[in-house]
Curated annotation (Swiss-Prot):
Reported cofactor(s): Zn(2+)
Sorted UniProt keywords: Cell inner membrane, Cell membrane, Hydrolase, Membrane, Metal-binding, Metalloprotease, Protease, Stress response, Transmembrane, Transmembrane helix, Zinc
Ligand binding (Zn(2+)): 143, 147, 225
Pfam families listed in its UniProt record: Peptidase_M48
Main location class: membrane
Species the sequence originates in: Aliivibrio salmonicida (strain LFI1238) (Vibrio salmonicida (strain LFI1238))
Gene3D superfamilies listed in its UniProt record: Metalloproteases ('zincins'), catalytic domain
Name recorded for this polypeptide: Protease HtpX
Segments passing through the bilayer: 4-24, 36-56, 151-171, 199-219
Length: 291
């Protein structure tokens, strides 16, 4: 419930800000709300713009949000092993050496992010390093490296941009029709009443459509997890990957949020699997056993 409430609150804030900004853009540019071509252009700009900016800033934002410390020069045997393992796996899949970081957290987790395959980040929690064997940790790293090699961050960004565009376009097209209908029925309210109707309806629809669209993006995220698991199995062997997932079943729920959670090794539980960024661990383990 906490995750769903946070999702709704975040989307509400984003949609309200978007509505205000887009209405200002309409006023400045003179584009009519009823112009479908103009609305589509604005929907594409805002729909893809936010996703692309988030992707480009993902490394810095991720490090700041978890308090991650980048390993510039390994200071101990664990950091040496971590750097060497990521470097070897990156060479195996043909990507540039990712930036490697460690963040302080009791949960066993790791995540990957970055705008390009050759300019990415792999971050590992202290809980994972302290509680997993080297074989298990190696499998987790292989999972994250596979996410990078598969281009999952870029693909997810493009998909989110398309989803955002449709959400914005459809909600505002419907809001425009509703405001036009009510303004004809209630001429006494004038332009102010029509604008408020448009603003309220578009905001509510953007929140509702955004929530429904999250089912699609979460499905895609779960789908990519199976591919990352399979990629890790190819790199280090499926027995190590299964052992890592078995270990995760004994750990606590992931503390990662947002896009980092989507590309972490372990996701959060939800009231329904449809709202989970990761498949249940049992399904992932069974899929690996069938390889």
């Amino acid at each position: 419930m906490k995750r769903i409430a946070l999702f709704l609150a975040t989307n509400l804030a984003v949609m309200i800000v978007f509505s205000i900004v887009l209405n200002i853009v309409y006023a400045v540019t003179g584009i009519q709300q009823g112009s479908l071509s103009g609305l589509l252009v604005m929907a594409v700009l805002f729909g893809f713009g936010g996703s692309l900016v988030s992707l480009l800033m993902s490394k810095k934002m991720a490090l700041r949000s978890v308090g991650g410390e980048v390993i510039e020069q390994p200071r101990n045997e664990t950091e040496h092993w971590l750097m060497e393992t990521v470097s070897r796996q990156a060479q195996q899949v043909g990507i540039g050496m990712p930036t490697v970081a460690i963040y302080d957290s009791p949960d066993m987790n790791a995540f990957a992010t970055g705008a390009k395959r050759d300019d990415s980040l792999v971050a590992v929690s202290t809980g994972l390093l302290h509680n997993m064997t080297r074989d298990e940790a190696e499998a987790v790293l292989a999972h994250e490296v596979s996410h990078i090699a598969n281009g999952d961050m870029i693909t997810m960004t493009l998909m989110q941009g398309v989803v955002n565009t449709f959400v914005i376009f459809l909600s505002r097209m419907i809001a425009n029709a509703v405001s036009g209908f009510t303004s004809n029925d209630e001429e006494g309210e004038g332009e102010g009443g029509s604008f408020m109707t448009y603003f309220i309806v578009s905001t509510v629809l953007e929140i509702a459509f955004g929530f429904l669209a999250s089912f699609l993006t979460m499905w895609f995220s779960r789908h990519r997890e199976f591919y990352a698991d399979a990629g890790a199995a190819n790199l280090v062997g499926k027995d190590k990957m299964i052992a890592a997932l078995e270990r995760l079943r004994m750990g606590q729920e992931s503390q990662l949020e947002g896009s980092m959670m989507a590309f972490g090794i372990n996701g959060k539980k939800s009231l329904t699997e449809l709202l989970m960024s990761h498949p249940p661990l049992e399904k992932r383990i069974n899929a690996l056993r069938q390889l």
